[in-house]
C-alpha cells in the first residue's frame, strides 16, 4: 500500500480551529430561545441539534473537523467496479454514469452533501481508475455492432420508471435496478453523460498530484479517437481554481487536456451564496471565488464550454436583493449564462454546526437560518439521507426573486427533478430544457449531435 503527503494549492488564512473567539456550544432549546428563535421545533429536532452540537464539540477539541493531507493509493480491478448511475430521482434526463476515483474529499466542505460535513475517513485514491473509465466507455459507448430494438428501448424506459418508484418507496432496491439499467445500456451507444465527480471534487490534490485526473481525461481523448461517433459526453462540476487547471503532470496540464475535449465536454463551476468569511471556514481547501472564476475564464478563452454554474449551497438568510445582484453580476461578467440553484440541505446534526459558525459572524443570520429549517411543518421537506431543505414557500419565493433578476441580465435557470417535484415547479416557470439548452444540473443538451 502506497501513501503520500501532499500540499494544498489553496488554503485560507483562518480555519475553524483558529477562528478568533470561537468555540463550539450546545445548540438546544434554551440556546435557540436565547437567540430569539420564535419557531418551536419538535422534540426530535431539538434532540438532533443537541446531539450534533456535542459531536462537533468533540471533533473540534480533537481537531478532526478538517481533512488531513494524507493519501492512501490503491489499485482496483476495472471489471469488478460497481457502476454507479447518478440519479436520485429516477427522472434524470439522460443516463449519467459517475466517475469517483477518490473515497473521501480533501476540499473539506462542512456542509458536504455526501458526508454531512464529516471528514474523518481516510482519503483513498485509485491510481488505475482510468482503466475502469476505459472499460466503462467502451462497454457503454463503443460503436454498437447492431441496431437497438424497440423492445430494448421499452425495457430501458420501464426500468427507469421502476427506478423512480423504487427511490421513493424502496431505496434499498435501487442498486439492483441500476445494475439492470447498466446491463441493458451496454453496447448501445446511447446518450450518456459521465459525471466527474459527484461524490468528491474532481480536481483536487489527490487526483492532480498523482496524475489520476490527467489519466482519466486522456481516456476520454483516447475513446473519441477510437470511436469518433461516440455519444459519451464528459460533465465536470468543480470548485477548482486556476492553479488546479494549470497543474501539470507528465508535461500536460488539465487545461491542455480539456482543450482536446472541447466539443465533447462541459465545465460547470460550483459556487455558493453565503458571506465570504463564512465561506472560507466552510470550504477550507477550496479555491477562492475569484480563482474559480479565473478557471472559468481560462476555459472560455480556449473555447471549452464553461457557461453554467452550480449555485449551491444557497444560505437563504443571506439572499438579499443586493447579494443577488452582486453575485449574479459577477457570474455573468465571466460569461456564465445558466445556473442551477440549490438551497442548503442539511441534517439537523449538521445544521447545529453550520448555524453556530454562521452565528460567530452574524447572530441575526444564525437565528434566521434555524427559523427557515426547523419548523415541524417543514419536517417532510427532505432530500436523500434525511437532509432537510428550507421552508417550501420561502424556497419558491427565493427562486422567483433570483429569476426575476437573472432574466434581466440574460441568464437561464435549470433545476433538478427533486426540486421541481418538491416545490411543484411547472414547465411554464422553468422548462425541462430551457432556452439556452440546459437541463437538470446544468447538463447542456446541445452537446449531443442528435438533439
Task: For every predicted segment, state its role.
Residues 2-41, 46-47, 294, 298, ...:
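Auxiliary Fe-S-binding modules of radical SAM enzymes
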Residues 85-86, 95-118, 152-153, 272-274, ...:
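Domain-start "cap" segments at the beginnings of catalytic or binding domains
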Residues 115-191:
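Conserved alpha-helical substructure of the radical SAM core
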Residues 105-114, 129-140, 321, 325-345:
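Hydrophobic, aliphatic-enriched repeat segments that assemble into extended interaction scaffolds
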Residues 161-394:
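Conserved AdoMet/S-adenosylmethionine-binding subsite of the radical SAM
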Residues 1-98, 103, 107-111, 119, ...:
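Flexible, acidic/Gly-rich N-terminal and inter-domain linker regions that tether
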Residues 102, 114-117, 126, 151, ...:
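Acidic/polar N-terminal loop/beta-strand segments that form early-domain functional surfaces
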Residues 107, 214, 397-400:
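A structural signal for well-ordered alpha-helical segments within the folded catalytic domains
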Amino acid at each position: 500500500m502506497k501513501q503520500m503527503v501532499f500540499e494544498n494549492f489553496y488554503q485560507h488564512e483562518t480555519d475553524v480551529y483558529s477562528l478568533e473567539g470561537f468555540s463550539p456550544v450546545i445548540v438546544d432549546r434554551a440556546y435557540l430561545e436565547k437567540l430569539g428563535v420564535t419557531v418551536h421545533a419538535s422534540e426530535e429536532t431539538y434532540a438532533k441539534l443537541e446531539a450534533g452540537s456535542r459531536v462537533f464539540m468533540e471533533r473540534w477539541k480533537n481537531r478532526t473537523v478538517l481533512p488531513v493531507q494524507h493519501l492512501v493509493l490503491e489499485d482496483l480491478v476495472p471489471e469488478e467496479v460497481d457502476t454507479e448511475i447518478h440519479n436520485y430521482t429516477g427522472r434524470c434526463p439522460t443516463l449519467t454514469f459517475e466517475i469517483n476515483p477518490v473515497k473521501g474529499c480533501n476540499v473539506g466542505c462542512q456542509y458536504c452533501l455526501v458526508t454531512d460535513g464529516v471528514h474523518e475517513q481516510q482519503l483513498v485514491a485509485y491510481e488505475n481508475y482510468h482503466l475502469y473509465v476505459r472499460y466503462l466507455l467502451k462497454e457503454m459507448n463503443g460503436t454498437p455492432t447492431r441496431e437497438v430494438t424497440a423492445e430494448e428501448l421499452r425495457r430501458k424506459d420501464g426500468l427507469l420508471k421502476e427506478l423512480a418508484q423504487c427511490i421513493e418507496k424502496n431505496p434499498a432496491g435501487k442498486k439492483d435496478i441500476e445494475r439492470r439499467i447498466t446491463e441493458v445500456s451496454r453496447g448501445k451507444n446511447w446518450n450518456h453523460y459521465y459525471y466527474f465527480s459527484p461524490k468528491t471534487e474532481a480536481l483536487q490534490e489527490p487526483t492532480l498530484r498523482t496524475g489520476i485526473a490527467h489519466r482519466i481525461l486522456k481516456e476520454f481523448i483516447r475513446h473519441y479517437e477510437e470511436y469518433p461517433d461516440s455519444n459519451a459526453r464528459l460533465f465536470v462540476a468543480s470548485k477548482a481554481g486556476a492553479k488546479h487547471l494549470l497543474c501539470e503532470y507528465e508535461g500536460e496540464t488539465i487545461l491542455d487536456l480539456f482543450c482536446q475535449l472541447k466539443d465533447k465536454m462541459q465545465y460547470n463551476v460550483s459556487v455558493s451564496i453565503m458571506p465570504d468569511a463564512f465561506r472560507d471556514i466552510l470550504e477550507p481547501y477550496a479555491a477562492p471565488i475569484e480563482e474559480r472564476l479565473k478557471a472559468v475564464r481560462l476555459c472560455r478563452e480556449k473555447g471549452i464550454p464553461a457557461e453554467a454554474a452550480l449555485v449551491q449551497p444557497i444560505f437563504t438568510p443571506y439572499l438579499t436583493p443586493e447579494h443577488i445582484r452582486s453575485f449574479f453580476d459577477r457570474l455573468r461578467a465571466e460569461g456564465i449564462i445558466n445556473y442551477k440553484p440549490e438551497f442548503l440541505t442539511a441534517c439537523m446534526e449538521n445544521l447545529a454546526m453550520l448555524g453556530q459558525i454562521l452565528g460567530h459572524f452574524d447572530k441575526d443570520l444564525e437565528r434566521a437560518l434555524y427559523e427557515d429549517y426547523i419548523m415541524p411543518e417543514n419536517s417532510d421537506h427532505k432530500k436523500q439521507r434525511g437532509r432537510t431543505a428550507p421552508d417550501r414557500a420561502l424556497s419558491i419565493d427565493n427562486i422567483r426573486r433570483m429569476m426575476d433578476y437573472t432574466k434581466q441580465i440574460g441568464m437561464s435557470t435549470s433545476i433538478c427533478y427533486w426540486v421541481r417535484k418538491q416545490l411543484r415547479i411547472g414547465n411554464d416557470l422553468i422548462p425541462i430544457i430551457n432556452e439556452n439548452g440546459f437541463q437538470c444540473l446544468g447538463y447542456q443538451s446541445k452537446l449531443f449531435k442528435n438533439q
